[in-house]
Every structure is written in structure tokens, then in C-alpha cells.
């Protein structure tokens, strides 16, 4: 619970502008891990230099951060929120679990730069994301999705 609370203390700036922060997260994910762009076919025709200003990238990034905010606010009691997310990402989108680990690190960097998440907060975010991703992985296994 303490880790969730520590991350939530810095969540305000993110929550105040999901679209801008979401765009930063996805653009950085695609820059640092170009292979992840292949997992988003709807962004395939967008030139790399245009990703940051693309409304679709911004909207999807906002969706990611809104869902993460809901999971954070559940403070560990997130099973009902996570199940449908796990299901769609395993069965429809076919997103390997490793990609959640990659985006979690990017979210941490963006939160450090834009929301003041300090070193202890970074550790708390890693702990929180490890819990969420482990639970997603268990959902994936139940669904028979293995990378």
C-alpha cells in the first residue's frame, strides 16, 4: 500500500494532462524500443518524427495513463480492473508481457521528469508495476497466452 501511495503523491500532474504525458510516454517507448511500434498497427504509417504530435498517439497514451491511474488508485485490489485489460491484450492485441515492463520503465522516466517522482518514488513505481505485471502474467497464463 505504501508504494501505491508514494506513486499517487506524484500522479496529480499526470492526471491533470493525460494526453500530453501519454504522448510523451508512447513517443519515448517507440524511440527507446523501436520494435514496440510494430505492436501498434494503427501507428504504422506515421513518420517517427511525427509521432509526438499525432492525435492518435496522444489519445492512446492518455488511455494507457488513465487505466494505470485506476490501477494505482485500487492500491492492489485491482483484479476486477486488470482482468479485462489482460484479456484484451492477450487475446486481441497479442502483446507480450515484456512490453509492459518496457513501458513501465518509460512511465517512470517521464514521471521523474514531469511529475517530480524521486528515487524512492521510482522504486515504489517499479514495485507497483511488478505487482500489476505479475498479475497480468497470471491472467495471460489462465487465458493460454504465452509469448
From Swiss-Prot:
Globin domain segment(s): 2-141
Higher taxonomy: Eukaryota, Metazoa, Chordata, Craniata, Vertebrata
Primary localisation category: cytoplasm
Catalytic activity annotation: Fe(III)-heme b-[protein] + nitric oxide + H2O = Fe(II)-heme b-[protein] + nitrite + 2 H(+); H2O2 + AH2 = A + 2 H2O
Positions that bind heme b: 89
Gene Ontology molecular-function annotations: heme binding; metal ion binding; nitrite reductase activity; oxygen binding; oxygen carrier activity; peroxidase activity
Class of the enzyme per the UniProt entry, highest EC level: oxidoreductase
Entry function: Monomeric heme protein which primary function is to store oxygen and facilitate its diffusion within muscle tissues. Reversibly binds oxygen through a pentacoordinated heme iron and enables its timely and efficient release as needed during periods of heightened demand. Depending on the oxidative conditions of tissues and cells, and in addition to its ability to bind oxygen, it also has a nitrite reductase activity whereby it regulates the production of bioactive nitric oxide.
Subunit (UniProt): Monomeric.
Subcellular location(s) of the protein: Cytoplasm, Sarcoplasm
Record organism: Channichthys rhinoceratus (Unicorn icefish)
Protein name: Myoglobin
Family as reported in the entry's similarity comment: Belongs to the globin family.
